């Protein structure tokens, strides 16, 4: 357990930041799931709309260190490829 005033403050800050990050990560995953669901249903317009919303979120969280930049790039690349394949098939 923390003994100094500074250590106690850091524990409080760490918990606050953890809760903030959990909420942001959850929001990001929700947007990714919405996009994946639209692709699965075959709805090109909804997929493109959701993809346009999720890309800036991924970029923002990658720049802030919430997720790794390669993870953001991987998600964007895979979703983009699936949407492109869906659009050409339709």
UniProtKB/Swiss-Prot annotation:
GO MF: small ribosomal subunit rRNA binding; structural constituent of ribosome
GO CC terms of this entry: cytosol; small ribosomal subunit
UniProt cross-references to InterPro entries, sorted A to Z: Ribosomal_bS20, Ribosomal_bS20_sf
Pfam families for this protein: Ribosomal_S20p
The organism's place on the tree of life at top rank: Bacteria
SUPFAM superfamilies according to UniProt: Ribosomal protein S20
GO process annotations (BP): translation
UniProt keyword list: Ribonucleoprotein, Ribosomal protein, RNA-binding, rRNA-binding
Tagged with keyword Cell membrane: no
Alphabetical list of PANTHER family matching this protein: 30S RIBOSOMAL PROTEIN S20, SMALL RIBOSOMAL SUBUNIT PROTEIN BS20C
Function: Binds directly to 16S ribosomal RNA.
The protein's name in its UniProt record: Small ribosomal subunit protein bS20
Chain's gene name: rpsT
